[in-house]
A protein has these predicted regions:
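N-terminal capping segment at the start of a domain
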Residues: 2-28, 129-130, 318, 378-379
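A non-catalytic alpha/beta surface segment that caps or lines the substrate-entry region
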Residues: 22-70, 74-76, 80
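Short beta-strand segments
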Residues: 76-78, 168-170, 193-196, 216, ...
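Glycine/charged-rich beta-loop-alpha catalytic/anionic-binding loops adjacent to active sites
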Residues: 120-135, 218-222, 342, 374-378
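Acidic/histidine-rich catalytic neighborhood of metal-dependent amide-processing enzymes
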Residues: 121-208, 248-268, 272-282, 288, ...
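Metal-dependent amide/peptide-bond hydrolase catalytic core
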Residues: 234-405
């Protein structure tokens, strides 16, 4: 079975994670796909398949006889999807021999356009998989799941020599909980790769340092007709906070290694207001400087409006795994060579986000990220090609071969 065929089967199983949940996994529906995957792994002949109470699926492919002492490597992908644009069933649409031009997405009124996605002409002639324009596709990261499963099938059925291989499928990556209950020792690999990137051939090991920053603003309500020098409007103080941040250091205006402040939510009235940000930077010193900027804003506004008016809470989320991967750059060099062996130009790029591999690297499992062939994740324009997925599978198979040498 080709990887894209598996993807079509997986995306119709709803698995949105829930950022407001306090359970693990954050949504019980993730077990629906986990059980399907565990059964499929067993049917393929993968060993030691297990599904635990936290919705982690593990499995192993024992080394080919004579290769038991080769480096053990693992492959990881996440089962959950973002909850945005996912309030009903996903309907994938297959466009064979795509012409590379603008493409209406069902009857949604949305169109996949070359203007918005300039890479589309390069996909001409491919089998393109899109949504109907009303949901995400879920290729993030069910494409990675499908590619790992297809790799496993190839290793087993084609008797490709390999060392010990570990596989895991995780829940809750999209809400930052993908490694909360990951058992590194049970997984059993010395090194691993997540398949959670974009274009096939991407190799990523430099991610953001990340935190979230929440402001709570307490106002002072007085009748507006008699509020001279008395009222403190919490909404206006909230506006002050945002205006004190650098206006060009937002996601829309940044790229590559540039960091940002991203306002993800706001609410309020005269008496109470809230601002919710995520803060990102690749450079540790610049990241700490961003947090200090936020603390400075809190201090200044409390001096202006009175102590306790503004309360800032900063919560660190993940770190840049580059400092860990720097000690095992064979992971990157072998990934480059695997791409070349598969006929794909390697593309080493910084991750403008994070993956499960970020946390796993700091848990003792160095774990860079590889591309899946997908594009425009987290929205109704998400798309992927069957051919790109085939190449992603070829790359990981070549990677396995390299570690068996």
């Amino acid at each position: 079975m080709r990887a894209y065929e598996r993807l079509l089967n997986y995306v119709v199983v709803r698995t949105p994670s829930d950022e407001h949940s306090t359970t693990s996994p954050s949504s019980q529906c993730q077990f629906d796909l986990a059980r399907i995957l565990a059964d499929e792994m067993t049917a393929l002949g993968i060993s030691d398949v297990s599904l635990d109470e936290f919705c982690y699926v593990y499995g192993k492919i024992p080394a080919t006889p004579g290769y038991e002492n080769k480096t053990s490597i693992g492959f990881i992908a996440h089962m959950d999807t973002v909850s945005d644009y996912c309030d009903h069933d996903i309907i994938p649409v297959v466009h064979k021999n795509y012409d590379g031009g603008d493409l209406p997405l069902g009857t949604s009124g949305r169109t996949l356009t070359v203007k918005d996605f300039p890479h589309l002409p390069s996909l001409a002639g491919c089998t393109l998989i899109t949504t109907d324009g009303t949901t995400v596709l879920g290729a993030d990261d069910k494409a990675g799941v499908a590619e790992i499963m297809t790799m496993a099938e190839a290793l087993i059925k084609e008797n490709i020599p390999h060392g010990p291989i570990s596989i895991a499928f995780t829940p809750d990556e999209e809400v930052g909980g993908g490694t909360d209950h990951f058992k590194v020792e049970k997984f059993g690999a010395q090194f691993a790769y997540t398949l959670d990137g974009d274009t096939e051939g991407e190799i990523q090991y430099e991610n953001f340092h990340a935190c979230k920053a929440d402001f709570e603003i307490t106002g002072f309500a007085v009748h507006p007709g008699s509020s001279k020098d008395t009222m403190i409007n919490a909404c206006l103080v909230a506006a002050e906070i945002n205006n004190m941040l650098p206006g060009l250091e937002i996601p829309r205006e940044t790229e590559d290694y540039e960091g940002f402040y991203h306002l993800t939510g706001m609410s309020g009235d005269v008496t109470k207001a809230e601002l919710h940000y995520i803060v990102r930077d690749h450079d540790k010193n610049l990241f700490e400087a961003r947090k200090e900027t936020l603390r400075h804003i809190e201090k200044n506004l409390n001096e202006k409006w009175g102590e306790g008016t503004v309360k800032l809470m900063i919560t660190d989320q993940y770190q840049n795994m580059a400092e860990i991967i720097a000690g095992c750059m064979h992971l990157i060099e072998n990934a480059k060579k695997a791409c070349e062996n598969a006929g794909v130009a390697p593309l080493v790029l910084p991750i403008r986000g994070g993956t499960d591999g970020c946390q796993l690297s700091f848990m003792g499992l160095p774990c860079p990220n590889l591309g899946t062939g997908g594009h425009a994740f987290h929205g109704p324009y998400e798309h992927i090609t069957a051919e790109g997925m085939d190449k992603a599978v070829d790359i990981v198979v070549e990677l396995v071969k390299l570690y068996a040498e």
